[in-house]
Amino acid sequence: MSTDADSSEEPAGRVKISDVARHVGVSIALVSLALNDKGRVSEKTRDRIRAAAKELGYEPSKAAASLRTGRSHRIGFLLAANVERDWSEQWYSMTSQLLMDVVNVSTRLGFSVIVLPNNPAKNSIAELDGLVVSDSLTTDKSIATATALGVPVMTNERPDDSMVAVNVDSGYRAMTRAALDHLRERGAKHPALLTEPLGLHSNELAEKEYLTWCAEFGLEPVVARGRHDRSDLSERIDELLETDCDAIYSFYEEGAEIQEHIRSRGLRVPDDISLVAAAPYSDDINREAGVSTTVYHPDQMVDAPLTALVDVIEGRVTPPVTVHTPWEFVIHRSS
């Protein structure tokens, strides 16, 4: 679990909010809400947390406490940093659609939306009732800052992070395992993973599931990581084809392009190499090319999760909350 909350809010040697959470056996998010008199926390639990904080000698940051006052009916949307500038068109297209969905749902629920830059100032976060962070970078400290200020956070693919009030499970782990199990059932003995760079929690979660799966079957992992902008996709496919892999699960949605490149190397799909690609939404190009696809739904990542975040803000639900969004496995002739 990330320890950014500890390093960003408390000097070395002082009792940290994570120490209180560990002592009571609850999440950091719940401790933060209890100590800031926010959210739905039973009096019994709130008393236990306060007693533990007193017993351990925990002293909240005075600066943070002075920043956090009342309700603003504002939800922050963190504009994540573009990890590769030449991928900006696709990155901002995805972000823009997500922002529109956040604005529409927030308005319906009686909240306005404030767009924040990457790594915003603490006082900007303190003015919010909640924070939405999409596909967070592993280096981002905003979630830790928000939690320390008592601002509940909604993000995705961080299932074991106690700083997150609402986690959206888009199916990355389940899709990865389903694809690998399917490839094995169809005769593949050594599936490889074609994925994007480390640094995004979603990518790392899927890769971790692949590594776990390989360990379960005693297989040596074969992973190729390409750029977000796809500029080295051909090279990464060739990298995998030089190994002994007989199947590929790709987190690049360009399944048809990958299949065509494999065939250009004189290999048959699926006879020599089986292929499954992950893609947002149902993909006509992959379907027409006969590429098996695990399909996830970014359009489902806002309504129910943001409603849950507002429930946390208004005390109707106790964090942490996990919202599962749908996914499906569409099998075609490539596997």
Language model regions located:
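Short beta-strand segments enriched in small/hydrophobic residues
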Residues: 30-32, 67-87, 130, 182, ...
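Amphipathic helical "hinge" segments at domain boundaries
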Residues: 56-122
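Short beta-strand elements in bilobed, periplasmic/extracellular small-molecule ligand-binding domains
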Residues: 102-117, 192-193, 207-232
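Flexible loop/hinge segments that line or gate small-molecule binding clefts
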Residues: 137-178, 279-291
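Hydrophobic alpha-helical segments within soluble ligand-binding/sensing domains
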Residues: 167-193, 230-238, 295-314
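An alpha-beta-alpha
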Residues: 177-217, 321-334
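Flexible loop/turn connectors
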Residues: 238-335
